[in-house]
Amino acid sequence: SGSCTVKTCWMRLPTFRTVGNLLKERFDGASRVIYGNKGSNRASRADMRHLEPEDPAHKPHSPQDLVYFERSPNFCAANSKVGTAGTTGRACNNTSLGLDGCDLLCCGRGFRTLTERVTERCHCTF
């Protein structure tokens, strides 16, 4: 008689890196929204369609967009109410483009460069 072939398809999640990159991209493009005139004071699923861009020049958000109501606090300045110490006086890495880099960590205030010469015994043999 005959033979049959079975194909099995498996659904697979993308890698963690892929998901993280997508979320970061959406986070960078997030826009602030306000309730439109049609909305109520409390957010429900039905009210989400009444969210409008804070800036009328921006296009309305799509269901895939990230939106926010409140601005983040200024983490550059100390704020005891929020519990942040600010970044003034922190050491930074002048050559880094990361979170420890002076451009980001000093929040555009500028920074002082400290050059330090250290002499140590190296226990070298020649």
From Swiss-Prot:
Keyword Metal-binding: no
Main location, first listed in the record: secreted
Organism superkingdom: Eukaryota
Cystine residue pairs: C92-C107
GO terms for biological process, alphabetical: canonical Wnt signaling pathway; cell fate commitment; neuron differentiation
Localization annotation: Secreted, Extracellular space, Extracellular matrix; Secreted
InterPro entries: Wnt, Wnt1, Wnt_C
Pfam annotation, one family: wnt
Residues carrying a glycan: N93, N94
Keyword terms of this UniProt record: Developmental protein, Disulfide bond, Extracellular matrix, Glycoprotein, Lipoprotein, Secreted, Wnt signaling pathway
Lipidation (O-palmitoleoyl serine): S1
Any GO molecular function: cytokine activity
Modification after translation (UniProt): Palmitoleoylation is required for efficient binding to frizzled receptors. Palmitoleoylation is necessary for proper trafficking to cell surface. Depalmitoleoylated by NOTUM, leading to inhibit Wnt signaling pathway.
GO cellular component terms attached to this protein's record: extracellular space
Family to which this protein belongs: Belongs to the Wnt family.
PANTHER family according to UniProt: PROTO-ONCOGENE WNT-1 (PTHR12027:SF91), WNT RELATED (PTHR12027)
Role, per record: Ligand for members of the frizzled family of seven transmembrane receptors. Probable developmental protein.
Protein name: Protein Wnt-1
Species assigned in the record: Alopias vulpinus (Common thresher shark)
